């Protein structure tokens, strides 16, 4: 529709693939690992895919982004609550009153701060210049997150609450580092 009716040029658009890493519904680890390597840039075309795109995983589901906006120590939330899949997370967030309609400009900044904390924990270099420069080649950082989360699941029985959706906000310049201003 966008392409045909409005002449939208997807070849010059940033494309993000939001993907739940719910262990109950997305069980094909080999496919996910393959996509981590192929979908590493929102703007640069991957020859294997014939289209650009950045894979942004959420652990265990996209509602993790709500948690990162509204919860303190969001990374530990799933472990502390015994949450192991997306359905359980949705229920827990609802019970705790962490609802999407409570997201504000201030909580979006909190979600980026939670993301930076989580990426530091994983071992991703989050110095402003390094992180922002890595957004055009995010596959390596994505892989670090994936490997770390899989190890946490083996050790603790579940993933840490984490959504990479804020990466898109940083990549698009909708949220900027204070160092950039």
Residue map of PLM features:
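Phosphate/oxyanion-binding active-site loops and adjacent basic polyanion-contact surfaces
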Residues: 1, 28-31, 161
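Activity-critical C-terminal alpha-helical subdomain
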Residues: 18-127, 169
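Glycine-rich, often proline-containing surface loops adjacent to acidic residues and nearby aromatics
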Residues: 9-21
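Short, surface-exposed loop/strand segments
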Residues: 1-10
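Extended, basic/helix-rich recognition subdomains
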Residues: 99-181
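Compositionally biased, intrinsically disordered low-complexity regions
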Residues: 9, 55, 159-162
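A generic signature of intrinsically disordered, low-complexity regions enriched in glycine/proline
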Residues: 9, 24-26, 151, 175
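Sequence-level detector for tyrosine residue identity
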Residues: 6, 16-17, 59, 77, ...
